[in-house]
Amino acid sequence: MKEVVSTSNAPAAIGPYSQAIKANGFLFLSGQCPFDPRTGAIVGANAVEQATQVLNNMQAILEDQGLGFGDVVKVTCFIKNMGDFG
C-alpha cells in the first residue's frame, strides 16, 4: 500500500508529484530544489548554500515521518557544474 507524504515544513511539489511516498516500510523522497518552504523563493547564491537548503528540505520530510539522515540508504545528486563537486 502506498501513502502520499506531505509536510508544510518543506516546499510544496511544483508539478504532478508528491514530496515523498511511503510504501512497504520505505520512504521515497522526490527530487528536492533549494526552495524556501514559506516563500517558494530559491535560497542561496552558490552551490553550497543551495545544497544546504536542499538538505534542510529533505530533513523536514524525513523528520515528518519520524526518520533522519541515518535512515537514508541511497541519494542521487544532479550537479550542473562539476566544478562545484567536492
Where on the chain are the PLM-derived regions?
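Short, polar/acidic, helix-capping and beta-turn segments at strand->helix junctions
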Residues: 1-86
